[in-house]
Design a protein with these regions (language model features):
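Non-transmembrane, aqueous-exposed alpha-helical and coiled segments at domain scale
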Residues: 242, 257-289, 295-343
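N-terminal basic/disordered segments at the start of proteins
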Residues: 1-6
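Active-site-facing alpha/beta catalytic cores
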Residues: 14-15, 19-265, 308, 316, ...
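Short glycine-enriched loops at secondary-structure junctions
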Residues: 54, 294-295
Length: 389
């Protein structure tokens, strides 16, 4: 919030029990670590690495039901609630799934600790991965100079005998949308040192655009726990709403307590965001501003796939940086739906995923994600924005 770090948050739109495997978790962590290395070098700021994982098993839906042909069933609301299979028994909500969410989240966190503390996250290893990405990609030449700069810096430190422990392990935090209040309440504990309540289902939790009503249960719950809290703000958000959320969720104006995650859409970001940032800044509140360039840029293709275009995602991030640069405020971070696998869910990017390509590896349980290559390409482009901020 004070401009002394950059926030990188990424992971699945909706986690599934089936995808909670060591390989899948490792690939997501690897992608986030690769992105963070590039962003950190070019921003000269610490990068706070946050996964949308170990709890992101529930999703709000615009429609309560889904119809296929003549059959209408309850909508899939994430593995925490029901199953994606289109049958009556699978779509029937089952509260026993929440126990499985807890157990799967615990197992995921154990794997995260192993990967981030056991040498897998060594900065030199991450740099070698990035070099491999550049060498194998169709657009590698564009980023080769940037990678070479990082390589020279690492080589200089190695030649000087510098081998800090910080190179070998990283702090990695877990986050999810606090959607199912009963689950979050069941995992709220009183800290023995401070006697304050914390939701121990995750380090960071956020409230979605659909559930951020001031008099709603989600805002009321978030106001009572001491975790850092995020709130999604869409294109219809007003300054008064933002200020009211600050009063409710952070009445003491504690820096870093509240994050506003903007999801405006590329067409709206430059028109809507300035008034929000300016109004909040003038109020004296110190919030962290993070760009979610995914949710405001979703559309359906002619062949029936929900998708996003890489250029729209990039343009929203670019607009986010432009607004903050003009106002003299800190573009605090990005919030990305991504996977470490080579899926084909979002269009464009250096590998030019086409509408026809969507058919080959469209694997998401909910919304489309950037694949490994698109995620890394975005990090190099955001790194350029950070350097010029």
């Amino acid at each position: 919030a004070a401009g002394r770090a950059f926030w990188l948050q990424g992971g699945d739109c909706a986690e599934t029990f089936a995808a909670a495997t060591a390989d899948s978790i490792r690939n997501r962590i690897k992608t986030i670590l690769q992105m963070a290395a590039v962003l950190q070098y070019y921003s000269s700021l610490p990068v706070i690495k946050v996964g949308r994982m170990a709890g992101q098993f529930a999703k709000p839906r615009s429609n309560d039901t889904e119809t296929r042909g003549d059959i209408t069933l309850p909508a899939y609301r994430g593995d925490a609630v029901n199953d994606i299979e289109f049958t009556e028994s699978a779509r029937t909500p089952d509260p026993n799934r929440l126990v499985r969410v807890y157990n799967t989240s615990a197992a995921t966190l154990n794997l995260v600790r192993a990967f981030t503390q056991g040498g897998f996250a060594d900065l030199r290893r991450v740099h070698e991965w990035n070099k491999g990405f550049i060498r194998d990609s169709q657009f590698g030449e564009k980023y080769e100079q940037m990678a070479n700069e990082i390589g020279r810096a690492l080589a200089f430190m190695e030649s000087a005998g510098v081998d800090p422990e910080q190179f070998k392990a990283v702090d990695f935090f877990a986050s999810h949308e606090a959607l199912i209040i009963e689950y979050e309440k069941a995992l709220t504990r009183i800290d023995s040192r401070t006697q304050l309540p914390y939701d121990v289902s995750g380090h960071f939790i956020w409230i979605g655009e659909r559930t951020r009503q001031l008099d709603g249960a989600h805002v009321d719950f978030a106001a009572k726990v001491r975790n850092p809290i995020g709130v999604k703000l869409g294109p219809k958000s007003t300054v008064n709403e933002a200020l009211a959320l600050i009063d409710k969720l952070n009445p003491d104006r504690e820096p870093g307590r509240l994050t506003f995650i903007t999801r405006m859409g590329a067409k709206n970001i430059r028109e809507v965001l300035p008034a929000l940032v300016d109004g909040v800044t003038k109020s004296g509140a110190e919030v962290l501003w993070v760009s979610d360039p995914m949710h405001g840029n979703t559309f359906e293709t002619k062949n029936g796939y929900k998708t996003r275009h890489f250029e729209d995602v990039l343009d929203e991030v670019r607009g986010f940086f432009e607004v903050h640069k003009k106002l003299g405020t800190h573009p605090g971070g990005i919030h990305i739906e991504l996977t470490g696998d080579d899926v084909t869910e979002c269009l464009g990017g250096g590998n030019q995923v086409s509408e026809k390509d969507l058919e080959s590896r469209y694997e998401t349980a909910c919304d489309p994600r950037l694949n490994h290559s698109q995620s890394l390409e975005l990090s190099f482009l955001v790194a350029e924005m950070l350097r010029d901020r």
